[in-house]
Regions:
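N-terminal start-of-chain detector that recognizes signal peptides
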Residues: 62, 164, 171, 215-221, ...
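Hydrophobic alpha-helical transmembrane segments in integral membrane proteins
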Residues: 202-230
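Structured non-transmembrane domains adjacent to transmembrane bundles in polytopic membrane proteins
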Residues: 221-418, 435-436
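Membrane-embedded transmembrane helical bundles of large multi-pass transporters/channels
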Residues: 1-213, 355-365, 369-557
Length: 557
């Protein structure tokens, strides 16, 4: 969110810098600059919020919380970095408008402020909120209020700002980038054809992307957890596995219910995806109701006897012939409990290689089919499967489903907002089109890179819409502003020289931020950082290469 927030600051401050050559007061420069870029920033904030909040349809608590928190953070970034930061900058420059004075001192103060700000956030979250707040207040005092006070005391009246004529390497790079995007924008039909072919191929690849859970995608392969799982698979293989749970509730003392449970166990014995012991028998974690019935030496054909036996097991545990406690009552209650006039029981089975999501999905589907014959039994009131592998499988399915829901919702809502704001279908449409390209390119690259859809990467689709629409809005809004008073050639040139370069700066800052996350030791965070950095780069390409070509075509018409 810090990386995204910088985008607001880059655009507003860049527009303010464009007005610095005008011989007017600093306050008027800020008003003119924000008057030009303010509507674009507001639209960008709204579209960002829509994209993030679309994740609340996911049905997964962590993803919903992510969407809500990101929406709040987008609003905070808009206020603090989009409005407050350039306003403070204009005030500081109005006090100390000699740009060549104390360059070294201002550089030291900037570095100190940035370092203390970053450190205060880390300390606030990980060490102590009180110490973090003290660091923030110290930062404001030392690097904002004190410099302003000192600058105001030594203020000099300078009528005209000195213009720096020397071009550093950054200015030269900006000019080269500007020339490239203007050259491409002047060949709109060829540009659109090339990117349309790229999009068609990337869409083909994106549709082949699969949702899966791999432990290696979430945890460091050298961590004790992953090493332990590898050793478990190596030494025990198909004789154990992650535990899946079959739940059955009803009048289980009924002999027919006992026969049905025996039939279920017999059917499961033939399932190769379930763990079997060295003798080839189905592995059922002890104690279970079938083994308890065998150990108590009851036939299971007498309902009253069954009920009394079950109640004794729950209250007293399993006592052997020598009057020794074999299973305590507490242990029995992990397998068998009484709820009113009904009993509930669970059968725990092993699922080998459950880290492979295809295996887990197969197990879930097959077990659900095997339980279907209990549907019409009057003595069975409830049944189902649960356990960590199946919960995880459902979460992944929900994540994939949320991806298919959140992307259309975010795109449609953004289009409606743009349509109302621009009051033009063609400008709203061409602003949204590049976003679809970004999503297609992103998931196509994910397929090529061997990534998969999981609880983390599924959210990036909606984020890509938020970032992409943000970039597109700035280009379209600036172009509409310039086209009112210039020809489309001049409007395009001013848009790309001004807003296009600002997009380059904001994109680079975000790419750097997420690329750093790509070095995280946990693959979950590392892949998120890498994919998001790629997504921001694609959003930049789409906004400065594809969108200008579309704007040229619709403006000519």
């Amino acid at each position: 969110m810090v990386s995204f927030g910088v985008d607001f600051a880059v655009h507003s401050i860049r527009r303010y810098q464009e007005e610095k050559s005008n011989n007017i007061t600093f306050d008027k420069k800020f008003i003119i600059a924000f008057g030009g870029v303010g509507s674009a920033l507001t639209l960008a904030f709204i579209s960002d919020a829509i994209a993030f909040l679309s994740n609340i349809t996911a049905g997964i608590e962590s993803v919903v919380h992510f969407g809500l928190a990101a929406g709040v953070a987008a609003f905070a970034s808009y206020i603090v970095l989009g409005i407050y930061a350039p306003f403070i900058l204009s005030k500081i420059e109005s006090i100390d408008n000699n740009n060549n004075k104390n360059k070294f001192l201002w550089t030291i103060e900037a570095i100190g402020s940035a370092g203390l700000s970053g450190g205060s956030v880390i300390v606030f979250l990980l060490v102590s909120p009180l110490i973090g707040i003290i660091m923030i207040l110290t930062n404001l005092l030392m690097f904002l209020l004190l410099p302003i006070y000192l600058a105001s005391r030594s203020k000099k009246n300078i009528e005209k700002e000195e213009k720096i004529n020397n071009k550093n390497i950054f200015v030269k790079f900006e000019e080269m980038f500007s020339n490239i995007i203007i050259f491409i924008a002047k060949k709109p039909y060829l540009t659109i054809l090339v990117f349309a072919l790229i999009t068609a191929y990337s869409t083909f690849l994106a549709l082949k992307l699969e949702a899966r859970f791999e432990v290696a995608d979430f945890f460091n392969e050298e961590s004790e957890f992953v090493v332990g799982l590898d050793k478990l698979d190596y030494h025990f293989g198909d004789t154990t596995g992650e535990i899946g749970v079959i739940y059955i509730k009803g009048d289980l003392s009924n002999p027919l219910a006992i026969e049905d449970m025996k039939k279920l166990i017999e059917n499961l014995d033939s399932k190769e995806f379930l763990a079997h012991d060295k003798m080839g028998e189905l592995l059922l974690i002890e104690p279970n109701l079938m083994s308890l019935i065998n150990q108590t030496n009851i036939s299971g054909n007498n309902k009253k006897e069954n009920q009394e036996t079950f109640e004794n097991l729950i209250n007293q545990g399993l006592i052997n012939e020598n009057n020794e406690e074999f299973y305590s009552s507490n242990r029995i209650k992990f397998t068998l409990i009484k709820e009113g006039d009904e009993f509930s029981t669970v059968f725990r089975v092993g699922i080998p290689d459950s880290a492979n999501q295809k295996v887990t999905t197969l197990a879930r589907n097959e077990l659900e089919k095997e339980l279907e014959f209990l549907n019409n039994k009057t003595y069975i009131s409830d049944f189902g499967i649960t356990g960590s592998p199946f919960v995880r499988d459902i979460e992944l399915s929900s994540a994939t489903s949320s991806l298919y829901k959140s992307i259309p919702i975010a795109a449609f809502a953004s289009f409606i907002v743009l349509l109302i704001t621009f009051r033009s279908i063609k400008y709203a449409l061409v602003t949204v089109i590049p976003i679809g390209l970004v999503v297609s390119w992103l998931y196509g690259i994910m397929f090529i890179g061997g990534y998969s859809l999981n609880l983390v990467t599924a959210t990036i689709g909606a984020i890509s819409i938020g970032v992409g629409i943000d970039f597109s809005i700035h280009i379209t809004q600036r172009f509409r502003e310039e086209i009112r008073k210039n020809s489309y050639d001049i409007a395009l040139q001013k848009t790309l020289n001004g807003t296009g370069i600002a997009l380059l700066g904001s994109a680079l800052s975000s790419i750097v931020g997420f690329s750093i996350m790509g070095f995280a030791p946990m693959p979950m965070f590392s892949s998120f950082g890498q994919i998001t950095a790629i997504m921001i780069f694609l959003a930049l390409i789409s906004s400065v290469f594809v969108l200008p070509s579309l704007l040229v075509i619709v403006s000519k018409k």
